[in-house]
Amino acid sequence: MKRSIHAIASCALVVASAPSWAQTGEKPDLSGNDPHWIEDTVSQCWAANPHPEGNENISWSGACEGGVITGPGTLTWSQNGRISGRDEGTFKDGRLTGKGRISTVDGASFDGEFPGPGVLTLPDGSRIPAQTVRDSTGWTIEAPVPGERTK
């Protein structure tokens, strides 16, 4: 999960997800060998991590199905021992699905549908109509040019 402001400032934020193994017919490699899956070592639930970085950890407050985060809950991301962001909503196959919210510690957030419309809020409080779309690595938040902000 990328939790950097430069991603939000450019109006594209990558959110935890990966191609659904339900769609591909292949189960995820939950052995720890695939860096695109990350495990909450307390709950022993795995979440999709399409853009892995070093020293990442997650904490999941929800259910597991087949070892993968499922249903309503909060996924908290940390890097180098510091919280970097949260994903809140309903998860399926290890990724946020339906109505949800992602937020970063610097105050940026997206509230909306996965996939679908929502509002991207920048750290300065500016609000931008946006939408989430699936791409080859997960969710991308697309927004119009920053001049179309609402306050």
Model-identified regions with their sequence ranges:
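Bacterial N-terminal signal peptides that target proteins for export
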Residues: 1-9
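Repetitive helical segments and hydrophobic/amphipathic motifs
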Residues: 11-15
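N-terminal signal peptide c-region/cleavage motif recognized by signal peptidases
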Residues: 17-19
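Glycine/tyrosine- and acidic-biased, solvent-exposed loop/turn segments at the edges of beta-strands
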Residues: 21-151
